[in-house]
Amino acid sequence: MKVAIIGATGYSGAELFRLLQAHPHVDRCDVYLSSQDGVHLSESFPHVGAVDGAVLHKLDIEALAKYDAVFFATPPGVSGEWAPALVDRGVKVIDLSGDFRLKDGAVYERWYGREAAPAAYLKRAVYGLTEWNRDAVREAELLSNPGCYPTATLLGLAPLVKERLIEEDSIIVDAKSGVSGAGRKAGLGTHFSEVNENVKIYKVNAHQHIPEIEQMLGTWNGAMKPITFSTHLIPMTRGIMSTIYAKVKQPFSLNDLIDLYKTSYEDASFVRIRQPGQFPATKEVYGSNYCDIGLAYDERTGRVTVVSVIDNLMKGAAGQAVQNFNLMMGWDEVEGLCFLPTYP
């Protein structure tokens, strides 16, 4: 199996390269970039070392068409331009950017501030929230990998929304991410002195992941209303914690709630539900493809609290991309991902 990564000099691309280099079914993994040619990936990431196949190639559609699968770990706009031609040539495409996540091009243009991909390909793209879309992922030619915040938030909300247990207008999401979620490009906001010993809220009511979350919630329950969603940058490298609050329609016990989640995710190899009174921490999924979920119910307020944690570069990006890649190729979804988190 021959695969290529476009955009391997970013954090998600580098993590994807690490996973695919060790994947049992991948014989060759090449790397491409729009701006460099003939430079070894170790120039950007010394930890890669002198790995064969890690020399960057400039984008070339005919060269890319010879691969079995191509991964886009690129900024918005790149896959929207290049992916359609690869799909037309029979190449499986897994896109880690947001270019194909939103079905309505006008919504994409409003939230991303750029031209949307062709409507026909937005329609063909399969949203790769693996645990809730396996059958469609298996048949996908163009796979849109979910964003990091949506992955943590949607996995945390799915059982409640699908079973219609919460008020449709009551969802509040308080999400926090490590600095790698902001990408590798240098900027004042991610300088050490700006983020160290500091917590910052950003993109208040304006994060591009809001319509992605609402789109999926709406497919599960057509009566869903807009959510309140806030994001914070915290001084750590990896990890996302999505703390979710919602008003229940009728009282239930915490044990019943946990049983619902355990039943919902009984076939999910990478979702782990905590026992009553236990809540996950980001360090407990570090470097893994796991999503850990803790639950609480407040009888005084009639609100449920869901705490969902992931590694933003793994389950929130490269790990979930490989999980979807596995299904698209007809393999067990856990191939190349069966390892515990790194701790401490």
UniProtKB/Swiss-Prot annotation:
Q: Where exactly are the transmembrane stretches of this chain?
A: none
Catalytic center at which residues? C148
Pathway(s) of this molecule: Amino-acid biosynthesis; L-arginine biosynthesis; N(2)-acetyl-L-ornithine from L-glutamate: step 3/4
Q: Where in the cell? A: Cytoplasm
Give the matching Pfam families. Answer: Semialdhyde_dh (PF01118), Semialdhyde_dhC_1 (PF22698)
Keyword field contains Magnesium: no
What enzyme category does the UniProt record give? oxidoreductase
GO MF terms held by the record: N-acetyl-gamma-glutamyl-phosphate reductase activity; NAD binding; NADP+ binding
Q: Which PROSITE patterns does the record match to this protein?
A: ARGC (PS01224)
What biological-process terms (Gene Ontology) are attached?
A: L-arginine biosynthetic process
| Reactions catalysed | N-acetyl-L-glutamate 5-semialdehyde + phosphate + NADP(+) = N-acetyl-L-glutamyl 5-phosphate + NADPH + H(+)
Q: Which GO terms describe its cellular component?
A: cytoplasm
UniProt keyword NADP present:
yes
Query: CDD domains of this UniProt entry?
Result: AGPR_1_C, AGPR_1_N
What are the protein's UniProt keywords? Amino-acid biosynthesis, Arginine biosynthesis, Cytoplasm, NADP, Oxidoreductase
The principal localisation class reads cytoplasm
Q: Could you tell me the EC number(s) of this protein?
A: 1.2.1.38
Against PANTHER family, the record matches this protein to:
N-ACETYL-GAMMA-GLUTAMYL-PHOSPHATE REDUCTASE, CHLOROPLASTIC-RELATED (PTHR32338:SF10), N-ACETYL-GAMMA-GLUTAMYL-PHOSPHATE REDUCTASE, CHLOROPLASTIC-RELATED-RELATED (PTHR32338)
The record's function comment reads: Catalyzes the NADPH-dependent reduction of N-acetyl-5-glutamyl phosphate to yield N-acetyl-L-glutamate 5-semialdehyde.
Report the family membership.
Answer: Belongs to the NAGSA dehydrogenase family. Type 1 subfamily.
Q: What is this protein called?
A: N-acetyl-gamma-glutamyl-phosphate reductase
Organism, by scientific name, is: Geobacillus thermodenitrificans (strain NG80-2)
Q: Which gene encodes it?
A: argC
